[in-house]
A protein has these predicted regions:
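Conserved helicase/translocase P-loop NTPase motor core
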Residues: 115-145
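Conserved RecA-like ASCE P-loop NTPase motor core of nucleic-acid helicases/translocases
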Residues: 42-83, 90
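Pre-Walker A (Motif I) flank of P-loop NTPase domains
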Residues: 33-39, 63
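Pre-P-loop entry segment of helicase/translocase ATPase cores
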Residues: 1-35, 91, 96-121
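A short acidic, amphipathic alpha-helical/loop segment
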Residues: 50-54, 81, 136-140, 162-170
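Conserved helicase motor core of SF1/SF2 NTP-dependent helicases
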Residues: 61, 69-73, 129-131, 145-196
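Short secondary-structure boundary/capping segments
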Residues: 82-85, 139-142, 190-194
Length: 196
């Protein structure tokens, strides 16, 4: 679907002590009705905790979730969020390129399978680079494209638009999360012809 800016009506979500799950509930409702939701906010506004709460509701329903971001650090920070701790402890969180340090940092996270698939009630955490490998001819021939009930594209302001479009195709529902204060992706060309 194309976004028509005349119809773009973002809704500001604020924490309400009377309804502490109000923000995540609104996002879950939007995903159920629209199958896509964009969440943006500056640092320190609780995006990671809110995302973890949304993911938790999908996992509780036995659904599959994939989270992708530019850097491993962002994935680890999300995995550490309180709403996801029971899944980490239960061995229901997989991550691509899981290092020894990450295993120590977040005990219970397991290495992702080569096909980047997860069973119902589990989450895959992959960098944008690793997740984009599912579109390689070799992986598509071997495994086909994975499909997730929810795909979460974190740090979307740093991702290329083509990556967002490709990753969105992997999910039934798509949650796009970004910080409008972050810089967009930077491409450096070493060819002097383009550096004028």
């Amino acid at each position: 679907p194309t976004i028509d800016y005349d119809e773009w009506t973002p809704e500001e979500l604020a924490f309400d002590e009377q309804k502490p799950t109000g923000i995540s509930d609104t996002i879950i409702d939007t995903l159920a009705n629209e199958h896509c939701c964009i969440v943006q906010g500056p640092p320190g506004t609780g995006k990671s905790y809110t995302i973890a709460s949304v993911i938790s509701s999908y996992l509780d329903a036995g659904k599959t979730v994939c989270v992708t971001t530019m850097a491993n650090k962002g994935l680890i920070e999300l995995i550490k969020q309180k709403p996801l701790q029971k899944y980490v402890k239960g061995g229901r969180v997989s991550k691509t390129n899981l290092s020894i340090d990450e295993r120590k940092q977040v005990s219970g996270v397991k290495a992702a399978s080569a096909d980047l698939q997860v069973p119902g009630g589990e989450i895959l955490c992959a960098t944008n680079y690793q997740l984009s490998s599912v579109y390689s001819e070799k992986k598509m021939t071997l495994y086909g494209l994975p499909k997730y009930d929810l795909i979460v594209i974190e740090e979307a302001s740093q991702a290329f638009l083509t990556a967002i479009v490709a990753f969105k195709q992997l999910g039934v529902d798509c949650l796009i999360v970004g910080d409008p204060m972050q810089l967009p992706p930077i491409v450096k060309l070493n060819n002097p012809q383009y550096n004028s």
